[in-house]
Amino acid sequence: MLETDNQTPLKLDFLLLEKIARLLAPTQMVELVLVSGEKMREINRNLRNCDYATDVLSFPLEAIPHTPLGSVVINMSLAQTNALKLGHSLENEIALLFIHGMLHLLGYDHEKDQGEQRQKESELIKTFNLPLSLIERVQD
């Protein structure tokens, strides 16, 4: 189940994201928060001590029964910029970022694993007929 908190003026259809959430976490609730670039920088600075606006952050919650899996926070300003730059829709860019964030909530870590997140992300991109994600675009 997907719970959304759109803190931007943009109106979006969340149907694809709901399908992704149901596939990856069929019994758990996931929170999706859409924020401005300025808000993302503030979150990143306050919670990770990194003073810049990143594209997506994931905050898993403890594995306690009947609690949400966690939150995925997406920088809508950067998502819009990247969608235009890469020539695909904003909805597709958000879906790519959501998949990336969801995999982090599920314990994947592309900085430490042996390509497992990259492989799972590729499978999901094909399943949902999405363009290449950042993790795939920078692949060697």
From Swiss-Prot:
- InterPro entries from the UniProt entry: MetalPrtase_cat_dom_sf_prd, YbeY, YbeY_CS
Keyword terms: Cytoplasm, Endonuclease, Hydrolase, Metal-binding, Nuclease, Ribosome biogenesis, rRNA processing, Zinc
For this protein, the Enzyme Commission number is 3.1.-.-
- Report the cofactor remark: Binds 1 zinc ion.
Any one Gene Ontology cellular component term annotated for this protein? cytoplasm
Note the superkingdom of the native organism: Bacteria
- UniProt-annotated location(s): Cytoplasm
Cofactor(s) for this UniProt protein = Zn(2+)
The GO molecular function terms of this record are: metalloendopeptidase activity; RNA endonuclease activity; zinc ion binding
In which residues is Zn(2+) bound? 100, 104, 110
- Protein's GO biological process: rRNA processing
Pfam annotation, one family: YbeY
In which broad location class does this protein mainly occur, judging by the first location in its UniProt entry?
cytoplasm
Question: What family does this belong to?
Answer: Belongs to the endoribonuclease YbeY family.
- Function, please? Single strand-specific metallo-endoribonuclease involved in late-stage 70S ribosome quality control and in maturation of the 3' terminus of the 16S rRNA.
Q: What is this protein called?
A: Endoribonuclease YbeY
- Tell me the classification of the organism that encodes this protein: Bacteria, Pseudomonadati, Campylobacterota, Epsilonproteobacteria, Campylobacterales
